[in-house]
């Protein structure tokens, strides 16, 4: 545990926020969101749980900020992937960011839930702004309108959500699937399952060559 004095200057507050986000992201890498405990994060940063609330009023906002940063990395990577739109490349681009995929799977029903109306609007506007270069590229590349591009991205997001949840069952369910060979078809690999899903999806959504 690192011991920090109270952050007073703006640069100290920024450093504290970065430390909280780094600790939370490291914890999420090997745990589910439910298992990411604020007490553990605060202890790792060297502050009390009460002090942590000075920076983030609820746990979900910590991980929503991590999601925003992951999205900022993913958006230009998707631009590269769509330059030669092969499903394998697109699926690999997504699976290279497991933190993004894990958070996407709980975005609507967990992370966005405590947002105020203003926060919700600001967040979605951020998503739209982040995807704007990709939208322009897909508009020019495939002659898709903005609503069509947004629909495509929403379908891809839905694929990530569904494939992640189905390929990451509860510990009890995972044990049951391993124990019974008759249930082998329910043992899903996220990367392979996502690629299969995108193959079926993109054939319907993207213009043929």
PLM features per residue range, with description:
Residues 15, 19-26, 44, 61-81, ...:
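Alpha-helical structural segments
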Residues 128, 140-195:
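Hydrophobic/aromatic-rich alpha-helical bundle segments in the mid-to-C-terminal region
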Residues 87-119, 166-168:
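Helical hydrophobic small-molecule/effector-binding pocket
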Residues 65, 79-103, 126, 152-156:
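Hydrophobic alpha-helical connector segments
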Residues 19, 27, 31-61, 65:
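Helix-turn-helix
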Residues 19, 40, 88-89, 151-158, ...:
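Amphipathic alpha-helical interaction segments
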């Amino acid at each position: 545990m690192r011991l920090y004095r109270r952050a007073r200057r703006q640069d100290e507050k920024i450093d504290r926020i970065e430390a909280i986000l780094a600790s939370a992201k490291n914890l999420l890498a090997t745990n589910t969101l439910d298992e990411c405990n604020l007490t553990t994060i605060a202890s790792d940063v060297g502050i009390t749980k009460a002090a942590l609330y000075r920076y983030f009023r609820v746990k979900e906002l910590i991980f929503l900020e991590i999601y925003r940063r992951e999205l900022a990395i993913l958006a230009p990577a998707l631009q590269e992937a769509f330059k030669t739109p092969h499903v394998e490349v697109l699926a690999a681009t997504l699976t290279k960011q497991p933190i993004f995929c894990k958070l996407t799977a709980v975005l609507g029903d967990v992370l966005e839930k405590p947002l105020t109306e203003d926060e919700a609007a600001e967040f979605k506007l951020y998503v739209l702004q982040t995807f704007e270069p990709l939208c322009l590229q897909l508009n020019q590349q495939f002659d898709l309108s903005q609503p069509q591009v947004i629909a495509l991205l929403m379908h891809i997001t839905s694929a990530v959500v569904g494939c992640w949840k189905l390929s990451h069952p509860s510990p009890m369910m995972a044990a049951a699937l391993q124990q019974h060979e008759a249930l082998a078809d329910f043992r899903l690999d996220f990367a392979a399952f996502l690629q299969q899903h995108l193959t079926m999806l993109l054939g319907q959504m993207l213009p043929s060559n």
